[in-house]
């Protein structure tokens, strides 16, 4: 293990000189192999093509290589109309674990635009005032027929929406870097875009030096890995829980409140300090030392400690249960915790039982310029009805997670690359031979334990852990304001009984600014049933389903109507998705084809 942990600034990359296309297909049913036709658009020239076979589409892209081809959900669907399983497996990739960012084949770089726009294409179109319309029913139901010009226009509209999105996000990124999109390449993900903009606008002067040989500035900062590792232990993530809702029981007259951009809010709040990785120290683990740091406006701390909540004291600290899930209802906490929650716990009446380790750091405000600058731009765009407001919002919300990336060993799948690795002297100690299809020992790949995928050059858990801790404190205060009327919470929202409305709004700031709360349900939810985390159903006065939240299962049919069993965990649920590449390799399936899985809730399922 390295004795130094580094964080390095990322700048703008050189412009890509090849052509850039967007691609979309229509199929007979949810099956990339049942190709009806496809369309493409050159995002720079606007030239559009229609392909009546996947072979024609592939030939077009390879004849124009080197080029980049974007499709929305490319690695779950569209790509596998062009590449077969063997080709996709052997192709060189940019990936982190099973997350694929780019597949390279015959000098064509295939990319998935969902990494830039983590939303449905219809939502992207709506933001541009370019509604994509409804998918023709014959494609949904696999009723094969002649392709019409109306069909083609529908598919081309998808390409135009995606091309518009890529141009706009590239323009936004480049201008934020003080460049034009013709002078710099577009990063692979919205998180990478956010990090590069932050580096350009907010990198600290003391985080770097002038190289004596080149005379160029090197933007980098270092710390003892111990501090990064202990902050990783304090990185608990978001809070989702049933509070006073009884699982599976009806509750009447419910309201939902959401915090406006909670994570950007806590990042930019002037009272919130974050640890400077270049100024960290271990401190004698005593209660007095902890309290002194908490009361010092120049420093922040995090501690490995044990705390407990006496009877009647609010419980809100994250505890990892035996099932591997976070539990916020426990009266005892043991582990690493960041200062914001230690401070709130002491305020609410928690008692420190023992402190095992205590670390402190100089406190800094690294996000104020980044968030405040983007927020000002977002408000300008919003007042002008400019669709780029959505892009700015994504950039504001995508930064903090970049600091908490956990890189994984690089996978090597290309046969030539595997052969090269096997000839290296350090092969036995460096590489691990694995198989996607372990039963038949097929589709081998190597894990390179000396080289990681994903950027650990941006990893500083001090930022990601403290952002989440501050956010959980904001959420905890809202839940406490709801009192026994608080039913459910999910990261930045609270559901309460209507009778708790007056008290909640007295104690919590409401409005449209960063961090203020807003009533998302001006029409009261007449009836709700909360089953478990990420699973609840709302009903209107006529007992019709108003909203169904059920992570991992299908709740609507192809017409957008709720399924009969949607939102009823006592009944059989189904997930409907497409086969991804690595699943296809493991299970002997065809990527890009429909996959339906039956799911029965382990607690509530009663049979059909």
Model-derived features with residue positions:
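Conserved acidic
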Residues: 15-22, 31-35, 41-608
